[in-house]
Amino acid sequence: MTDFINTSASRSLENAVQDHFIAAEAPWSGIVRKGQTIRIEDSYGQQAIDTLFYRADDFGERYSNQDTMRAQGGAYIGTGTKIISNEGNVMLVMTADSCGRHDTSAGACSCESNTVRFGHGTKYLHACRDNFVLEVSKHGMSKRDIVPNINFFMNVPIKPNGEMTIVDGISAPGDYVELVAEMDVLCVISNCPQINNPCNGFDPTPIRVLIWDGEA
């Protein structure tokens, strides 16, 4: 684990209003209020972090990968990207990105996809979809509310013919993204447990999430 990196004079470990260490393979969820900044940190490097966002007062409005990609005209997100909802509203804006590669197309691993990709022996391995089902259930939602997600720090090159392949991640220990909330949002994370492809370097590790109030 690396030392804390400052991206703003007004943000430090001491003035974070929330600071969460999320175990390898575990889910997490929390509210990010309008104007707050959330940092999602890949503490040990090469760890995919599957993430969903919902409007906090109306879960029917949620992150839309197709609207986000359409609005920015590209498949990858980075500093300056506006995270768009299925209602066409800006949910968050990415204000910092020390890695530069995040996937919006490959979705979350599941028991079903593990079976298809890696064989029947992997069917019951822990998967992100299980994490999402568990975590959204705490907020009165079900698997019907799980939509295509962002995979922070996951490296999925897309060829001109549309072919995609999950390859080794490029994130280093301590790499992070920061997003400012443009509305109150529920953030739901699956710290990806996948061990059958290189999205986690075949070794899932803990991550960290910090939240700060808006700058004075």
Give the ranges of each region predicted by the language model:
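Acidic, Ser/Thr/Pro
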Residues: M1-A216
